[in-house]
Every structure is written in C-alpha cells, then in structure tokens.
Amino acid sequence: EAPVLVHFHGLEGDSRSHYAEALMDHCVKNGVRGVVAHFRSCGGRLNRLPRAYFAGDTADNSWVLKNVHARFPKAPFFAVGVSLGGNQLAKCLGDLGKAASFVTGAASIGAPLDLVAGTEIMTRGANIFYGKMFLSTLKKKAEEKARLFPDIIDARAIRACKDLYDFDNVYTAPIHGFRSGMDYW
C-alpha cells in the first residue's frame, strides 16, 4: 500500500504555501499519499468558534493523524511539521505516547521551541517583515471573530496590537485559557 504523509504547516500557512505545495508535488511524483492539515481559520475559511490555534494546541493534530490513519490503516504513515506545525507535531506525538505507534516516522522542521525568543526575534532585523506579515493576517482573522463574538473578543484591542507580543497578550492567550502571552509561551 502507498505510504501516507501528513503535513502540518507553519504560522498562517496553508496548502498553498510554497513549501506545502513543493512537498505535496514530491509526494505525487513518488507515489505517496500527501495530506495537508489546515489549522483553524487557515486555508481560506474562518472557523466558527472564537478560538484559533496556538503552539501547544495538539487536539486537532491528534484528530487529523488518527482519522487519516483510520482511512489507510495498513499504509506506512509519516508526519512532518514545519515551524509552528513542527512544534505542534512534536508535542502531539509526545502527548499521544504509545497511542502514536502507528506513525512510522516524523520530522519537525524549524520548530520554534522557545516561543519567547521566537517572538522577540520577529521584532527586529529582517525578521520584522515576517512579524508584521503574520501580525497582519492574524489581526484580520481576530477582527472577523470579534464581529462574531463581540462579548469575548475586543476588536479595538486587536486593532491596537503593534506586534506578536501584543497579539498573544490580547487574543491568543485569553481566548485559549492562558493568563498572558508569557503564560502561553
């Protein structure tokens, strides 16, 4: 049976990200069934809940891995995560422990293991452009969610965010049950 590879993209990525497309093209050319899992509100559709996704959130990853494996139970099964997706994948497999024994192999590429340092790096040098790009798309989605959930998401506070640190303090942390960005990181 043809092998299966599940790919978890990075922050604000999706199946159209250049690295996801390249990986899936490689899968097709080599007889591998490739799957790209979209994080909540990535891939062009806003999810219907106030929450989004964050580095330590592994429930969706676990669900994807188990459900894809259930469709191809006899196939060699691989998973790869890039950047934030690598962080989530590594944590997910650790959380699953022996329940992840169906995974033949996995790779975490460029995962931000130190979120404090990673967020800080996005505020200086050439990385500031990435930080601003991520912040722009994250804010847009959070503002859309604020229109849907005005009692729990403060659109004005979202608009006032100047960097990822602000965003994690105003949205990511509180909406996912953390006291602050630092508590989340």
Residue map of PLM features:
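Short beta-strand element of the alpha/beta-hydrolase
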Residues: A2-G10
